């Protein structure tokens, strides 16, 4: 009971709090993403973009901690809440879908919540902040993006940034909900009558290091995982555009060690 309560209250709960704070700060009207959007087309644009990217990296680091314990409320409905925050574990991004979001941000009635999960989350924000060609990734003749490449560079940057803001707000809402729902669930998780089930959940969570980190994040891109049918599968890299993938693996390992050891190694 002491071990489960220690992990739930002193490791998992702070992870959710940190992620919610990072997501809310990043998405706020005075946060680094908003400042970048305001700076597009003026002399401070490059510095503001660097600041927005740094803010995204901080958010991604916080997300990687909660990726190590996909249990409880975030696992419900096939992990919908988890994948709303970061969809990598459920499959690859849809760059074309993200481009369609950027091309549609000015449309009346556009709702980011109507987009698929592989077009949302921190991975989609990464694409919008780091993909530098500004060319859409859809097939020729796609009605949503057919005029996108003809727009001016500044217009495309602005629309991408507006799309990133919509997605960041959605991530912040999901992160806050995940924090609150874990807080509500904690008493059930740590209840003496549920210790057996909660211990099994933690055991299952430990295998995330093997399945998500070793097999998917490293094994697939390197061609070690038999699911990769080629010599290597670089399209399976978690952070293809920011080159942040090894940093996220490090963050996973740090979070796993704390989860395994408990707060203060207890």
Segments from the language model and where they lie:
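Mature extracytoplasmic or organellar-lumen-exposed domains after removal of signal/transit peptides
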Residues: 1-266
């Amino acid at each position: 009971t002491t071990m489960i309560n220690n992990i739930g209250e002193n490791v998992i709960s702070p992870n959710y709090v940190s992620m919610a704070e990072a997501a809310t700060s990043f998405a706020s009207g005075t946060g680094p993403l908003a400042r970048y959007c305001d700076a597009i087309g003026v002399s401070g644009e490059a510095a503001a973009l660097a600041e927005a990217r740094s803010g995204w990296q901080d958010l991604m680091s916080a997300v990687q901690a909660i990726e190590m314990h996909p249990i409880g409320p975030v696992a419900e409905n096939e992990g919908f809440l988890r994948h709303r925050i970061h969809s990598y574990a459920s499959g690859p991004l849809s760059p074309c879908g993200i481009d369609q979001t950027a091309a549609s941000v000015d449309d009346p009635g556009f709702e980011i919540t109507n987009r698929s999960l592989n077009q949302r989350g921190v991975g989609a924000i990464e694409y919008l902040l780091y993909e530098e060609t500004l060319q859409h990734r859809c097939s020729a003749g796609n009605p949503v993006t057919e005029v996108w490449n003809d727009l001016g560079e500044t217009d495309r940057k602005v629309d991408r940034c507006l799309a990133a803001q919509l997605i960041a707000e959605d991530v912040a809402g999901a992160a806050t909900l995940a924090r609150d729902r874990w807080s509500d669930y904690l008493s059930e998780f740590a209840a003496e009558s549920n210790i057996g089930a909660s211990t099994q959940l933690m055991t299952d969570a430990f295998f995330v290091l093997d399945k998500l980190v070793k097999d998917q994040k490293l094994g697939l891109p390197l061609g070690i995982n038999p699911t990769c049918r080629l010599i290597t599968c670089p399209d399976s890299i978690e952070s293809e555009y920011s080159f942040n993938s090894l940093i996220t693996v490090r963050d996973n390992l740090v979070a796993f060690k704390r989860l395994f050891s408990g707060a203060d190694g207890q």
